[in-house]
Amino acid sequence: MTPEKLAHIAGILFDKDGTLLLYDESWGPVNREAARIASAGDAELEPQLLFSGGMDPVSGHTRPDSLLAAGNAAEIAAGFVAAGSPIAVAELTRLLDDLFIRSAEFSVPVTDLAALFGKLKARGFKLGIASSDNEQAIRLTAIRFGIIDHVDFIAGYDSGHGVKPGPGMVLGFCRATGLDPAEVAMVGDNNHDMHMGASAGVGLKVAVLTGTGSRETLSASADICLADITALMDLLPEKLHA
């Protein structure tokens, strides 16, 4: 990666869970509640659903790029039904979306998001959030952590831009900000994020290690792996646009 490549970056599109938020702390309890809802009172089914979604019901570890790590509510619902949930996919999707909206109140940030976004905005960067969560939950999270006024674009799986790993959310960010994909850094914690960035032709794919992915699972698809999003301050150059 060359300084020239970094110098062309003018916008940063962030994934939410595992990127802005610590994944295990924020989503471990939510995943267990999702399985409880989907089991419809069958206590023996709950751990089976968790395992089918990629979470070890004993250790709480969630596999990188698994359904629970990277899927949206509709995909998780379909997976749970395939694994034995007696609830119809459409109804379970609605129940999971409602759960994810409520859960925004309990999410745990990686850092002081308002301070970080304020510094990046002061440098002139356009900022966006693209998540497999629903848009309402993303907005509630952005409001809760004081970054809503710093964000130029928000997209969830239900926002009309398509779903990951397709390019739609990145291209929507570009339309909203007037940037070319080559001017965008995609930042995320799993390969869905990196593949979305690649499919849209972003200038930089940044993986962070605060989610379910590891350096081993992400290094092939990312341009660089960072410990967390705070390292962006040193990675990206000062940009003082008017």
Where on the chain are the PLM-derived regions?
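Asp-based, Mg2+/Mn2+-dependent phosphohydrolase catalytic module
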Residues: 1-10, 25, 40, 118-121, ...
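N-terminal helical cap/lid subdomain that shapes the substrate entry/recognition surface
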Residues: 6-114, 123
